[in-house]
Amino acid sequence: KSNVYGVIACQGDSLTFGSRDPDGMSYPIYLGRMLSQKHGQTWATVNFGVPGECWAELWRRNYHELLSVPEAGEVCLWMGTNDAWKDRSIEQSLIACEAVLDQCRALGRFVYLATLPGKRGFGAPREPWKMNEAIEKLNVAYKKIAEERRLQLVDLTDMPVEHFCDGIHLTQAGNKWVAEKFLAAIEARR
């Protein structure tokens, strides 16, 4: 077996996938490289981001995805923007969120749960701005869930507006900023 220090599964939607990045980059790529370079060890991240998906869709694929990477003891979870955009019931989204977290726990994976920055800035797509109200409710719930389940909360709510390329998706600098936030959470746990 190769000398790999850590493997981290990164699950989410287009924000995890890296949609809109001109070079196909994503926060998971940067996170793996930052961990490897900073600590002089081999870290691997696996990007399971699927554009357009919500918590319920992640639940359908989550268990199988995590089984495909048994060496990934940690999971970066960043989901919920599409739940808010598609105006899904907050209650139902949170049931699906908790079901995903139950799957992670059943497989013995530690979760870093990220909050949602919401929709900001000039040039934002024409999705309803009211989605930010739903995002605020999800973020409040995420904080409570992280506390109750002893997960590591990764707060992305204060993402600088210049890190958005279209009000929702991220610039390359935005992907690096998110990677740095997950990096800090991963290091804080050690």
Protein language model annotation of sequence segments:
Residues 1-51, 63-71:
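Serine-esterase "nucleophile elbow" of acetyl-processing enzymes
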Residues 13, 19, 50-53, 81, ...:
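Gly/Ser/Thr-rich helix-start
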Residues 33-41, 57-190:
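Alpha-helical cap/lid subdomain in secreted, periplasmic
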